[in-house]
């Protein structure tokens, strides 16, 4: 398959429970700081041909592309943790959910102001995430001036 073309099956879709589980696990895979554990999580929830369209306009392909990109972001976000913000929304084989990045240790403190706020939109095929879009609504540009670069 060409990197310029993505095919999606439209005949069937997963249950809402499967979709919610996948988007929650998508957000949580950033909690794996060990690259081998993160790669195992990536392989469990993402299709081999995953395409990730990230907030800065970059595109990443396959399990190795997700591992490389997530490693770069985690290196930039040392001392911070991802957490889900609210619930997931599901429509057939598409799901969306919001997330935040907060200082490590403050994940349960919902008064903690996040340094990044964003969300993910994903498309699932055969119980694996096939396409992922990540967007950022707000981030601390002083603290994270080179985020994603």
Where are these regions (language model features)?
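A beta-strand edge to alpha-helix "cap/lid" segment located at domain peripheries
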Residues: 2-13, 18, 73-149
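A solvent-exposed, acidic/Ser-Thr-rich amphipathic alpha-helical stretch
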Residues: 37-93
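Compositionally biased, intrinsically disordered low-complexity regions enriched in proline and serine
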Residues: 30-33, 61-64, 81, 136, ...
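General structural signal for alpha-helix termini and helix-helix connectors
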Residues: 32, 52-55, 106
């Amino acid at each position: 398959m060409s990197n310029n073309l993505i095919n999606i099956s439209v005949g069937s879709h997963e249950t809402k429970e499967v979709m919610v589980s996948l988007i929650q696990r998508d957000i949580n895979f950033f909690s794996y700081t060990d690259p081998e554990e993160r790669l195992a999580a990536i392989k469990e929830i993402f299709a081999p041909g995953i395409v990730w369209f990230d907030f800065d306009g970059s595109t990443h392909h396959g399990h190795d592309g997700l591992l490389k990109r997530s490693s770069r972001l985690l290196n930039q976000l040392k001392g911070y943790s991802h957490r889900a913000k609210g619930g997931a929304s599901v429509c057939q084989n598409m799901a969306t959910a919001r997330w935040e990045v907060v200082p490590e240790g403050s994940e349960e403190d919902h008064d903690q102001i996040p340094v990044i706020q964003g969300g993910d939109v994903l498309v699932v095929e055969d119980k694996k995430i096939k396409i992922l879009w990540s967007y950022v609504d707000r981030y601390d540009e002083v603290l994270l001036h080179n985020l994603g670069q």
